[in-house]
Amino acid sequence: MVQKYYESDADPRTLEDKTIAVIGYGSQGRGQALNLRDSGCRVVIGLRPGGSWQKASEDGFEVYSVAEAVKRADVIQILLPDENQAAVYRAEISPNIRENACLMFSHGFNIHYGQIVPPPTVDVVMVAPKGPGHMVRRTYEEGKGVPALIAVHQDATGQARAIALAYARGIGATRAVVFETTFAEETETDLFGEQAVLCGGITSLIKAGFETLVDAGYAPEMAYLEVLHETKLIVDLIYEGGFTKMRDSISNTAQYGDLTRGPRVIGPETYMAMQEILEEIQNGKFAKEWMLENMVNRPVFNALTRADEEHLIEQVGAEIRGFMPQFRK
């Protein structure tokens, strides 16, 4: 069973005399930094010029270059995009990190695939909230928290796990629950979930359903409403209470169709494709492909993104959402 931690397992005094540098001030960076500060931690922000510098300053933080923030910090939380982390680490973090400092991540990609190799004199940990930054912040302000994962890759000081737990408490995660994992497990399951189910799987399934109905002569608007618009209704029910709550909330006709037709759509061929995708994640093929894609300015990424942006389902969706007050700006 997975090890679970709660408020009583995390000692906030572990961070009492430490300065935390949050590198990056996007959604996660801002949410985590604000929560840490409200929990009594000393936080500085490390950024490259421009971008979020002004926003972080307006939020009342001391903002420095990445290199300067790292020099001042005992804990360095890297919250930059995966594809940017290695270059920033080599240029600005590695030359300035203190001995016995703690290097922290919210995703294990760069450590797991060897793009960042820290010295043996520092702790290397992960604290990964299972929710976007704005939710991390909102739930904290409500007195609750978003669950998180922690992992210890390297324990140079003997305090790595204690630091990770104290940080998780600082962002509010121990108010919910914190699960212990490994960098390998977090990275591989996270990538698989994104590719096969949450992002790649769902969008491909929706497009296939939309195209099937449109090709059969049904109105694109009807196809959109049936295979995309109503997705949120079903997913929300599953999120709240699993498959059981969803099936308790739909008609018997819908449930019978779900149970008898669903496995024909997601059958043995899909399972085999998922196994292949998982193997490419495990053996590093996907990571290598993504790193090479970034080295040549993302031609495949950009072409596929444009193609989906121009798909009929996006045009129809924009029109239908225009009729709905909740989506009007």
From Swiss-Prot:
Cofactor binding, per record: Binds 2 magnesium ions per subunit.
Residues annotated to bind substrate: 251
Record: active site: 107
Binding residues for NADP(+): 25-28, 48, 52, 82-85, 133
Binding site for Mg(2+) 1: 190, 194
Domain KARI C-terminal knotted intervals: 182-327
GO BP of this protein: isoleucine biosynthetic process; L-valine biosynthetic process
Binding sites annotated in the UniProt record for Mg(2+) 2: 190, 226, 230
Pathway membership: Amino-acid biosynthesis; L-isoleucine biosynthesis; L-isoleucine from 2-oxobutanoate: step 2/4; Amino-acid biosynthesis; L-valine biosynthesis; L-valine from pyruvate: step 2/4
Cofactor annotation: Mg(2+)
EC annotation from Swiss-Prot or TrEMBL: 1.1.1.86
NCBIfam families registered for this protein in UniProt: ilvC, PRK05479.1, PRK13403.1
The name this protein goes by in its record: Ketol-acid reductoisomerase (NADP(+))
GN (gene name): ilvC
